[in-house]
Amino acid sequence: VDYAHTGNALENALSMLQEIIPGKVSVVFGCGGDRDRGKRSEMTRVSQTLANRCWATTDNPRSEVQEQIFDDMREGVTDPSRIDFVVDRRRAIELALKNAEPGDCVLIAGKGHEPFQEFGDTVVPFDDRKVASELLELMKLGGRF
């Protein structure tokens, strides 16, 4: 889990992981609403360049409609077969973890330490670290999501 929420930060994190991970590197990432729309396609392009598999999802859409954020992000798609757009962030994390194999790494980027998501004026509890831990524990116990 990393706070990488710019193209440069995402590039640094993914480049480092590609150097040290023996398997595939996947990334779950999103772009915040009411922020620089220009960085959205760049984050997608960086993800597609440096990760083997990508899941684009929500990351504090705030007052923006998530589909508009996704439309901006889609402008950076270079290989549609290696990226899925999943509105539900928990589901995106779940899919990334389910698709990982021993030796692989899943980077969950963008929110880092933040324990919430912002949807309009509503703040919803959501912590990537806790969600990933819960899902990994279910996997360890043989549970289904």
Locations of the language-model features?
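ATP-dependent carboxylate-amine ligase
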Residues: 1-145
